[in-house]
Amino acid sequence: MKNIRNFSIIAHIDHGKSTLSDRLIQTCGGLSDREMEAQVLDSMDLERERGITIKAQSVTLDYKAKDGETYQLNFIDTPGHVDFSYEVSRSLAACEGALLVVDAGQGVEAQTLANCYTAIEMNLEVVPVLNKIDLPAADPERVAEEIEDIVGIDAMEAVRCSAKTGLGIEEVLEEIVHKIPAPEGDPNAPLQALIIDSWFDNYLGVVSLVRVKNGMLKKGDKIKVMSTGQAYNVDRLGIFTPKQVDRTELTTGEVGWVVCAIKDILGAPVGDTLTHQHNPATAALPGFKKVKPQVYAGLFPVSSDDYEAFRDALGKLSLNDASLFYEPETSSALGFGFRCGFLGLLHMEIIQERLEREYDLDLITTAPTVVYEVELTNGEVVYVDSPSKLPPLNNIGDIREPIAECNMLVPQEYLGNVITLCVEKRGVQTNMVYHGNQIALTYDIPMGEVVLDFFDRLKSTSRGYASLDYSFKRFQSANMVRVDIMINGDRVDALALIVHKDNAVYRGRELVEKMKELIPRQQFDIAIQAAIGNQVIARSTVKQLRKNVLAKCYGGDVSRKKKLLQKQKEGKKRMKQLGNVEVPQEAFLAILHVGKD
């Protein structure tokens, strides 16, 4: 056990976590050179295309150190994007140490900080590593000072390496062996194993990634899941060397996978504890804090026949992704679907793309909203995650919107642009600290403004140099109203949005103009209106298509022409009473882009 090291890698997006993990695997001979490919651990197609890590993955490597001993390194790769920070905290719970990878050219960024603080709170040993020192722009001295200044850990001794060329990888491995403590735990105590992650395999059922804290887990053991009390037989277990390798047992301190033929998707929840059925542990291990979704959106299948398949797909995805929340919802415009909760817009895009790719579904998404706290006139408090659930105006005493605390690291020359952006988003500055050329800004910004397009705008105003980390802080009173979109006098529930009163007229007018371009012309006029309650704030009309009924009258009497025109007019009138307007898919997506350009 003293030769086991459990660690994960934390870093900002694009600072080279996945490339470094490739080199570690190659150096320790986890895969032969023939099987090696770039970003081995990013196994999802989506991860490769976007170049980001979404799911945490684990690998067990054997490393023969310079002191002659062979160490077992259990290494868990973590995502760097702010939307996936819950994946990071899960990975860290299974480790004793973390490598803090910082790009020697770019220096410390906001996510590096956030993830690093998470690690320090969990009492992990943080080992700084300066990556990409082969780049001409690398300045390891300055970055080492930055780490000490901003993060506050000793970095003068930090290992310098280049994951791309393989320089300094041996030194990184030696640091891991010497600095990160061995796992603690009692091999003879009753079994306690923490479920770090679960996913669904069509042949094996639920596969769980576990970290054994105490005791031993053997093939053929009878185990039970502590939260549900269900008992299972261990059919197979083993480790990843990235390839799945079977073993007969997992001992204290090891990380590996377990298959117990669990058919039910909710059979092995993430963060739960496994123990023996006959000799159970007295208490469960502390799990992870439940993540609350920050953004809600309705997802509806384009054809209603796909509803069942859609429900099953969501079930399988939610097993793999603990932070996905969903409940059934019906809409008069779109039929049956689900209201889903996500951690952020990137998370929402990825889930939608995974549903469309892996499960072959066609989906319509409604505009994302955040959760509002609404106090009714009778003193009752309700939480509203969709505009259609907002109570009537005369029943509402107070609407409180969620405020996010945003920590940004901004280079000095872009400070003005970023402050302008924050003010435009109704932000309030709470702190500002200078660290050399970088400035740490803290703003309280309404969550609704942050989740829509704040991240993209922040990147574009600062040419990609500013970085952001945000977390929910509190609810605060605000003058929010619901803007309804009406087409020919009928409210379309899927197009409603909750906005601040100051922006309502502007957003309403913009949305109405956009809808005018997207709704195809019919044989009659279509009136598109935006309204708050009964007050219409914007309107535009899609003009009718009109057939020239006088084409065949050459000369002749004017009363003949009048008769034909009158007949056409009556026909149009009747058509308008009966006619239905098809709202195309693009119109629902238009809401997302309102206020961007």
Curated annotation (Swiss-Prot):
Listed Gene3D superfamilies: 3.30.70.240, Elongation factor 4, C-terminal domain, Elongation Factor G (Translational Gtpase), domain 3, P-loop containing nucleotide triphosphate hydrolases, Translation factors
Q: According to the UniProt entry, what is the EC number of this protein?
A: 3.6.5.n1
Q: Does the keyword Transport apply?
A: no
Q: Name one GO cellular component term.
A: plasma membrane
Q: What GO terms in the biological process aspect are recorded for it?
A: positive regulation of translation
The membrane-topology field of this record reads: Peripheral membrane protein
> Do you know which NCBIfam families this protein is assigned to?
lepA, small_GTP
HAMAP family on file: LepA
* Protein name in UniProt: Elongation factor 4
- Gene name tied to this protein: lepA
